[in-house]
Curated annotation (Swiss-Prot):
Source organism, top-level taxon: Bacteria
Organism per entry: Pseudomonas paraeruginosa (strain DSM 24068 / PA7) (Pseudomonas aeruginosa (strain PA7))
Catalytic center residues: E107 (proton acceptor)
Name of the protein: Ribose-5-phosphate isomerase A
Keywords: Isomerase
The organism's taxonomic lineage, starting at the top: Bacteria, Pseudomonadati, Pseudomonadota, Gammaproteobacteria, Pseudomonadales
GO cellular component: cytosol
């Protein structure tokens, strides 16, 4: 199977996993990116079986609405049973790097609210140590230089992502050459830098379930 077929397989597996738990009042948290888009397409075939969705980005909200799935603001939702999203990297503890699509802050907020965070990815995303994929950091624009200097002190090589503004109006620094042996500790350190909104490490709140698309089918990993 090619990469898109693997993504489709894990997207369908996620739908199959959550469907038995959904009812007419259920609201599903939905992530951002190419794998999440396959999940939206698969979920849309069952839109009569749940109430609606919370989107982690404007792009996701648009795709959900195009499928006729009602989109709710997170502040109006009292509970969220599931959040389903992709990842740029995952280790075996289901600590993730996310944010390649620049939606990391809203993704992290929705993941924090959800009772169960299901990550869907193809097998290439599972790595022994996080950090080969550059770590995205969302930054208040006026703090860009200050934050970059602090990231260098942590051993990283930050690169400004040209031409990208997040849905929150901020910029992204992609931090290269980090060997992330202690993801929870590094997540906290970077988030403590003044001017950082958040970073793409999902370690303090990792995924609960990883559905991994492989040539031999979908594998399920639990934290």
């Amino acid at each position: 199977m090619n990469q898109d077929q693997l993504k489709q397989a894990v997207a369908q597996a996620a739908v199959d996993h959550i469907l038995p738990h959904l009812d007419s009042k259920s609201i599903v948290g939905v992530g951002t990116g190419s794998t999440a888009n396959f999940f939206i397409d698969a979920l849309a075939r069952h839109k009569a079986e749940f109430d609606g969705a919370v989107a982690s980005s404007e792009a996701t909200a648009k795709r959900l609405k195009e499928h006729g799935i009602p989109v709710y603001e997170l502040n109006t939702v009292s509970e969220l049973e599931f959040y389903v999203d992709g990842a740029d990297e995952s280790n075996e503890r289901l600590e993730l790097i996310k944010g390649g699509g620049a939606a990391l802050t809203r993704e992290k907020i929705v993941a924090a609210v959800a009772r169960t965070f299901i990550c869907i990815a193809d097998a290439s995303k599972l790595v022994p140590i996080l950090g080969q994929f550059p770590l995205p950091v969302e930054v208040i624009p006026m703090a860009r230089s200050h934050v970059a200097r602090q990231l260098v002190k942590l051993g990283g090589d930050p690169v400004y992502r040209e031409g990208v503004l997040t849905d929150n109006g901020n910029i992204i620094l992609d931090v290269h050459n980090l060997r992330i042996d202690s993801p929870v500790e590094l997540e906290e350190k970077i988030n403590a830098i003044v001017g950082v909104v958040t970073n793409g490490l999902f370690a303090a709140r990792p995924a609960d379930l990883l559905l991994l698309g492989t040539a031999d089918g979908v594998q399920t990993l639990k934290a």
